[in-house]
Amino acid sequence: MAIITASMVKELRERTGLGMMDCKKALGEADGDMEKAIEDLRKASGLKAAKKASRVAAEGVVKTKIAEDGNFGVVIEVNSETDFVARDDSFLAFAQQALESAFSDSDADVTNLLDAGLEGPRQALVQKIGENINLRRVARLHFDDANQGIVESYVHSNNKIAVLISLQGGDEALARDIAMHIAAVNPMVVRPEDVPEDVLTKESEIYSAQARDSGKPEEIVEKMISGRLRKYVAEVSLLEQPFVKDPDIKVVELLEEAGADIVQFVRYEVGEGIEKEEEDFAAEVAAQLSG
């Protein structure tokens, strides 16, 4: 049996980022063989990551990066189980690594990015932190030529909301202001005509039921439905919204003044669409006490 020294444990900790006891145990089981200990820890990391994969990861961060010439940008979301881990330096380092990978490979989706080199670091982070970690999604906006337009981004100070926007005409300041507006107001689409037909149908049915309950004449009911639907479409369409920094003008008017047009936007909010598990703290404590 090899003697496991403090310097060996220290080296393994530095190479893996894992805790002292995990490293000491791995070296003991590997009979002091550093490389075998690392290999065993990597295998254990994969098993641990697989076991935790079913746990809901709905916290985390969003990050963006824009090319120097402004013709390309990327936004990603990386999830953890708790907000505490989302502020951990190791988690943030992995998120930055994922961002750089997504920026470098302009065609890769999440699966391709993981297969290309992120899955190993992800599993190692799961092993180190003890939570499920996911690269959830990635999106990119670009122009073939920088003269065609600009791509800009805005990330809210808490790193929970990020917006990527592509603009023809205007400048970076305008693009960033509109991205900030999108982060705050959360429009569904750019233009009224972009609202999906199924959404319009659903809203129309709701307004119809509400209006008919009023007992008003049919012609009045139809006008009520039409008016409410127009109002809804305006509220969810970016161009028709009052500009958040100057509510006296609409976003479309701001763009017209600058001779600019919005091509596309992407808005990510951490955890949106993920069904979070409801924790019963009292029941959890009771279970631990009875166990």
Put a short name on every predicted segment.
Residues 2-291:
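N-terminal assembly/interaction segments in proteins that build large macromolecular machines
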